Protein backbone atom coordinates (compact mmCIF):
# COMPACT_ATOMS: atom_id res chain seq x y z
CA UNK A 1 0.00 0.00 0.00
CA UNK A 2 1.59 3.25 -1.15
CA UNK A 3 1.90 6.26 1.14
CA UNK A 4 2.72 9.89 0.35
CA UNK A 5 6.12 10.27 -1.40
CA UNK A 6 6.93 6.61 -0.72
CA UNK A 7 8.89 4.92 -3.52
CA UNK A 8 9.59 1.66 -1.69
CA UNK A 9 8.08 -0.65 0.90
CA UNK A 10 6.65 0.67 4.15
CA UNK A 11 8.84 0.66 7.25
CA UNK A 12 8.85 -2.73 8.96
CA UNK A 13 7.00 -2.95 12.27
CA UNK A 14 7.26 -6.70 12.84
CA UNK A 15 10.05 -9.31 12.60
CA UNK A 16 8.19 -11.02 9.75
CA UNK A 17 8.07 -7.84 7.66
CA UNK A 18 11.79 -7.29 8.29
CA UNK A 19 12.44 -10.76 6.85
CA UNK A 20 10.20 -10.01 3.85
CA UNK A 21 12.10 -6.76 3.23
CA UNK A 22 15.40 -8.61 3.38
CA UNK A 23 14.14 -11.24 0.92
CA UNK A 24 12.93 -8.48 -1.42
CA UNK A 25 16.37 -6.83 -1.40
CA UNK A 26 18.11 -10.21 -1.77
CA UNK A 27 16.01 -11.14 -4.83
CA UNK A 28 16.32 -7.67 -6.35
CA UNK A 29 20.12 -7.83 -6.09
CA UNK A 30 20.18 -11.17 -7.92
CA UNK A 31 17.91 -9.80 -10.67
CA UNK A 32 20.09 -6.71 -11.11
CA UNK A 33 23.23 -8.85 -11.39
CA UNK A 34 21.58 -11.06 -14.04
CA UNK A 35 20.32 -8.03 -15.99
CA UNK A 36 23.74 -6.35 -15.99
CA UNK A 37 25.51 -9.55 -17.04
CA UNK A 38 23.07 -10.26 -19.92
CA UNK A 39 23.24 -6.63 -21.09
CA UNK A 40 27.05 -6.74 -21.06
CA UNK A 41 27.15 -10.01 -23.04
CA UNK A 42 24.68 -8.69 -25.64
CA UNK A 43 26.64 -5.45 -26.00
CA UNK A 44 29.92 -7.31 -26.52
CA UNK A 45 28.34 -9.67 -29.07
CA UNK A 46 26.87 -6.82 -31.11
CA UNK A 47 30.01 -4.69 -31.19
CA UNK A 48 32.82 -7.16 -31.89
CA UNK A 49 34.08 -8.57 -35.17
CA UNK A 50 34.76 -12.15 -34.05
CA UNK A 51 32.99 -14.89 -36.00
CA UNK A 52 33.11 -18.68 -35.95
CA UNK A 53 31.58 -20.16 -39.08
CA UNK A 54 32.28 -23.74 -38.03
CA UNK A 55 30.58 -23.74 -34.57
CA UNK A 56 27.83 -26.37 -34.65
CA UNK A 57 27.39 -27.01 -30.91
CA UNK A 58 29.14 -26.20 -27.66
CA UNK A 59 28.63 -28.86 -25.02
CA UNK A 60 30.54 -26.96 -22.34
CA UNK A 61 28.56 -23.74 -22.70
CA UNK A 62 25.29 -25.71 -22.82
CA UNK A 63 26.15 -27.36 -19.51
CA UNK A 64 27.02 -23.97 -18.01
CA UNK A 65 23.79 -22.25 -19.07
CA UNK A 66 21.77 -25.18 -17.73
CA UNK A 67 23.47 -25.52 -14.33
CA UNK A 68 23.99 -21.80 -13.59
CA UNK A 69 20.27 -20.82 -13.72
CA UNK A 70 19.45 -23.81 -11.49
CA UNK A 71 21.97 -22.60 -8.90
CA UNK A 72 20.59 -19.04 -9.09
CA UNK A 73 17.04 -20.35 -8.61
CA UNK A 74 18.16 -22.24 -5.49
CA UNK A 75 19.52 -18.99 -4.01
CA UNK A 76 16.02 -17.53 -4.46
CA UNK A 77 13.97 -20.63 -3.54
CA UNK A 78 15.58 -21.55 -0.20
CA UNK A 79 15.04 -18.15 1.50
CA UNK A 80 11.53 -18.06 0.02
CA UNK A 81 10.63 -21.49 1.44
CA UNK A 82 12.04 -20.49 4.83
CA UNK A 83 9.78 -17.43 4.86
CA UNK A 84 6.73 -19.47 3.83
CA UNK A 85 7.22 -21.80 6.79
CA UNK A 86 7.81 -18.84 9.14
CA UNK A 87 4.50 -17.32 8.05
CA UNK A 88 2.64 -20.57 8.83
CA UNK A 89 4.22 -21.05 12.25
CA UNK A 90 2.08 -20.20 15.29
CA UNK A 91 4.18 -19.43 18.39
CA UNK A 92 2.05 -19.66 21.57
CA UNK A 93 -0.07 -16.55 20.95
CA UNK A 94 -1.01 -14.33 23.89
CA UNK A 95 -4.04 -12.82 22.14
CA UNK A 96 -6.37 -14.31 19.53
CA UNK A 97 -8.28 -11.83 17.37
CA UNK A 98 -11.06 -13.03 15.09
CA UNK A 99 -11.64 -10.91 11.98
CA UNK A 100 -14.87 -11.16 9.97
CA UNK A 101 -15.19 -9.45 6.60
CA UNK A 102 -18.51 -7.97 5.44
CA UNK A 103 -19.64 -5.80 2.56
CA UNK A 104 -18.16 -3.29 3.40
CA UNK A 105 -16.80 -3.24 6.93
CA UNK A 106 -14.88 -5.42 9.38
CA UNK A 107 -16.02 -7.10 12.60
CA UNK A 108 -13.56 -8.00 15.36
CA UNK A 109 -13.85 -10.43 18.27
CA UNK A 110 -11.28 -10.81 21.05
CA UNK A 111 -11.56 -14.55 21.63
CA UNK A 112 -9.73 -14.47 24.99
CA UNK A 113 -12.41 -12.27 26.57
CA UNK A 114 -16.18 -12.58 26.93
CA UNK A 115 -18.39 -10.24 24.91
CA UNK A 116 -15.56 -8.09 23.57
CA UNK A 117 -16.47 -7.50 19.94
CA UNK A 118 -17.22 -4.54 17.69
CA UNK A 119 -17.70 -3.46 14.09
CA UNK A 120 -15.23 -1.15 12.37
CA UNK A 121 -16.43 1.27 9.68
CA UNK A 122 -14.52 3.87 7.70
CA UNK A 123 -15.13 7.43 8.90
CA UNK A 124 -16.66 9.44 6.01
CA UNK A 125 -14.66 12.43 4.82
CA UNK A 126 -17.32 14.93 5.96
CA UNK A 127 -17.18 13.53 9.54
CA UNK A 128 -13.39 13.31 9.77
CA UNK A 129 -11.40 15.27 12.36
CA UNK A 130 -8.94 17.88 11.15
CA UNK A 131 -5.96 15.60 11.87
CA UNK A 132 -7.64 12.39 10.66
CA UNK A 133 -6.51 10.25 7.74
CA UNK A 134 -8.83 10.47 4.75
CA UNK A 135 -10.24 7.09 3.62
CA UNK A 136 -8.04 5.33 6.20
CA UNK A 137 -9.42 6.18 9.64
CA UNK A 138 -12.11 4.06 11.29
CA UNK A 139 -14.56 4.56 14.14
CA UNK A 140 -13.24 1.55 16.12
CA UNK A 141 -9.55 0.71 15.98
CA UNK A 142 -8.01 -2.67 16.77
CA UNK A 143 -6.02 -2.33 20.00
CA UNK A 144 -3.18 -4.85 20.43
CA UNK A 145 -0.24 -5.14 22.87
CA UNK A 146 3.24 -4.68 21.44
CA UNK A 147 6.04 -7.26 21.77
CA UNK A 148 3.58 -10.15 22.10
CA UNK A 149 2.56 -12.90 19.70
CA UNK A 150 -0.86 -12.21 18.18
CA UNK A 151 -2.93 -14.82 16.34
CA UNK A 152 -5.42 -13.65 13.71
CA UNK A 153 -8.37 -15.82 12.63
CA UNK A 154 -9.96 -14.51 9.44
CA UNK A 155 -13.24 -15.36 7.72
CA UNK A 156 -16.07 -13.63 5.84
CA UNK A 157 -19.86 -13.71 5.77
CA UNK A 158 -20.60 -12.84 2.14
CA UNK A 159 -17.84 -12.59 -0.50
CA UNK A 160 -14.05 -12.87 -0.63
CA UNK A 161 -12.12 -10.20 1.28
CA UNK A 162 -8.45 -9.93 2.25
CA UNK A 163 -7.22 -8.52 5.59
CA UNK A 164 -3.96 -6.72 4.86
CA UNK A 165 -1.61 -4.56 6.94
CA UNK A 166 1.58 -4.03 4.86
CA UNK A 167 3.88 -2.70 7.60
CA UNK A 168 3.21 -5.84 9.68
CA UNK A 169 3.75 -8.20 6.73
CA UNK A 170 0.21 -9.58 6.99
CA UNK A 171 -2.09 -10.41 4.08
CA UNK A 172 -4.64 -13.16 4.65
CA UNK A 173 -7.75 -14.01 2.65
CA UNK A 174 -11.19 -13.83 4.27
CA UNK A 175 -13.18 -16.65 2.69
CA UNK A 176 -16.84 -17.47 3.53
CA UNK A 177 -17.10 -20.85 5.26
CA UNK A 178 -13.36 -21.07 5.90
CA UNK A 179 -11.23 -19.97 8.86
CA UNK A 180 -7.70 -18.87 7.92
CA UNK A 181 -5.08 -17.98 10.49
CA UNK A 182 -1.72 -16.30 10.78
CA UNK A 183 0.32 -14.65 13.51
CA UNK A 184 2.59 -11.65 13.98
CA UNK A 185 4.44 -9.64 16.61
CA UNK A 186 4.36 -5.84 16.62
CA UNK A 187 7.73 -4.53 17.81
CA UNK A 188 6.89 -0.85 18.24
CA UNK A 189 3.95 1.32 19.35
CA UNK A 190 1.95 3.31 16.82
CA UNK A 191 -0.84 3.23 14.26
CA UNK A 192 -0.65 0.80 11.35
CA UNK A 193 -3.00 1.14 8.40
CA UNK A 194 -4.23 -1.40 5.91
CA UNK A 195 -7.09 -2.06 3.52
CA UNK A 196 -9.10 -4.88 2.02
CA UNK A 197 -6.93 -6.30 -0.78
CA UNK A 198 -9.51 -8.42 -2.60
CA UNK A 199 -12.04 -6.76 -4.90
CA UNK A 200 -15.33 -7.34 -3.09
CA UNK A 201 -17.86 -4.99 -4.65
CA UNK A 202 -18.76 -1.34 -5.08
CA UNK A 203 -17.28 -0.10 -1.79
CA UNK A 204 -14.19 -2.31 -1.79
CA UNK A 205 -11.96 0.78 -1.51
CA UNK A 206 -13.72 1.89 1.68
CA UNK A 207 -12.78 -0.97 4.04
CA UNK A 208 -9.73 0.40 5.87
CA UNK A 209 -7.98 -1.34 8.76
CA UNK A 210 -6.35 0.48 11.68
CA UNK A 211 -4.21 -1.39 14.22
CA UNK A 212 -3.10 0.55 17.29
CA UNK A 213 -0.14 -0.98 19.13
CA UNK A 214 0.27 -0.02 22.80
CA UNK A 215 2.30 -1.29 25.81
CA UNK A 216 0.82 -4.18 27.78
CA UNK A 217 -0.14 -2.13 30.86
CA UNK A 218 -2.21 0.25 28.68
CA UNK A 219 -3.75 -2.71 26.87
CA UNK A 220 -4.91 -4.19 30.20
CA UNK A 221 -6.49 -0.83 31.13
CA UNK A 222 -8.23 -0.69 27.74
CA UNK A 223 -9.57 -4.23 28.17
CA UNK A 224 -10.85 -3.36 31.66
CA UNK A 225 -12.63 -0.26 30.36
CA UNK A 226 -14.26 -2.24 27.53
CA UNK A 227 -15.42 -5.01 29.86
CA UNK A 228 -16.97 -2.49 32.26
Curated annotation (Swiss-Prot):
Its EC number is 7.1.1.9. Disulfide bonds: none annotated. Residues 49-62 are mitochondrial matrix. Binds a dinuclear copper A center per subunit. CDD domains: CcO_II_C (cd13912). Residues 1-26, 83-228 are mitochondrial intermembrane. It is a multi-pass membrane protein. It is found in: Mitochondrion inner membrane. GO terms for biological process: ATP synthesis coupled electron transport. Its cofactor is Cu cation. GO terms for molecular function: copper ion binding; cytochrome-c oxidase activity. Cu cation A1 binds at residues 161, 196, 200, 207. It comes from the Eukaryota. Keywords: Copper, Electron transport, Magnesium, Membrane, Metal-binding, Mitochondrion, Mitochondrion inner membrane, Respiratory chain, Translocase, Transmembrane, Transmembrane helix, Transport. Component of the cytochrome c oxidase, the last enzyme in the mitochondrial electron transport chain which drives oxidative phosphorylation. The respiratory chain contains 3 multisubunit complexes succinate dehydrogenase (complex II, CII), ubiquinol-cytochrome c oxidoreductase (cytochrome b-c1 complex, complex III, CIII) and cytochrome c oxidase (complex IV, CIV), that cooperate to transfer electrons derived from NADH and succinate to molecular oxygen, creating an electrochemical gradient over the inner membrane that drives transmembrane transport and the ATP synthase. NCBIfam families: CoxB. This is Cytochrome c oxidase subunit 2. It comes from Aedes aegypti. The lineage of its organism: Eukaryota, Metazoa, Ecdysozoa, Arthropoda, Hexapoda.
